[in-house]
Amino acid sequence: MKYDTSELCDIYQEEVNVVEPLFSNFGGRSSFGGQIITVKCFEDNGLLYELLEENGRGRVLLVDGGGSVRRALIDAELARLAVQNEWEGLVVYGAVRQVDDLAELDVGIQALAAIPVGAAGEGIGESDVRVNFGGVTFFSGDHLYADNTGIILSEDPLDIE
């Protein structure tokens, strides 16, 4: 499904929070949306492997990497796993790598920047926790919508149809 965050903001202005414009699109899907699962991890993507193994249909993985752009939390291998398990998208408050490969995959990926250095894989981090970045507080179960214009968040799903 295609999402237009500008249109959604016009219709649901009082019901959405708008994330500050910090993110760029790296995935092959220009827009995506779904119910979020929150993750907090710093320069370590081991926990992301576990979560992306789950069925992601209708879900978006929201990763608080502390804003670090020293190590990429998402690479082509993880993005392929997201596609395989039907995740709608990934939002990473951190970095990604292998961007040419990411752009070819049918998954939304928004992140701060790209860097060639990979993350550690020790599995350090926590999921289903409150995270805050970009002027917005995110909880697992909230609904996120993203496109090339921006990212918005709603406590409840928006009536798109």
Swiss-Prot record:
UniProt keyword annotations, A-Z: Cytoplasm
GO CC annotations on file: cytosol
Subcellular location: Cytoplasm
Keyword hit for Cytoplasm: yes
Disulfide bridge positions per record: none
Residue ranges the record marks as coiled coil: none
CDD domains: RraA_family
InterPro entries membership: RraA, RraA/RraA-like, RraA/RraA-like_sf, RraA_gpbac
Chief localization: cytoplasm
Any Pfam family: RraA-like
A GO MF label: enzyme binding
Gene Ontology annotations of biological process type: negative regulation of RNA catabolic process
Superkingdom of origin organism: Bacteria
Protein family per UniProt: Belongs to the RraA family.
Subunit structure: Homotrimer. Binds to both RNA-binding sites in the C-terminal region of Rne and to RhlB.
Record function comment: Globally modulates RNA abundance by binding to RNase E (Rne) and regulating its endonucleolytic activity. Can modulate Rne action in a substrate-dependent manner by altering the composition of the degradosome. Modulates RNA-binding and helicase activities of the degradosome.
HAMAP family listed in its UniProt record: RraA
UniProt-listed PANTHER family: 4-HYDROXY-4-METHYL-2-OXOGLUTARATE ALDOLASE 3-RELATED, REGULATOR OF RIBONUCLEASE ACTIVITY A
Protein name as it appears in the record: Regulator of ribonuclease activity A
Organism annotation: Cronobacter sakazakii (strain ATCC BAA-894)
Phylogenetic placement of the source organism: Bacteria, Pseudomonadati, Pseudomonadota, Gammaproteobacteria, Enterobacterales
Gene: rraA
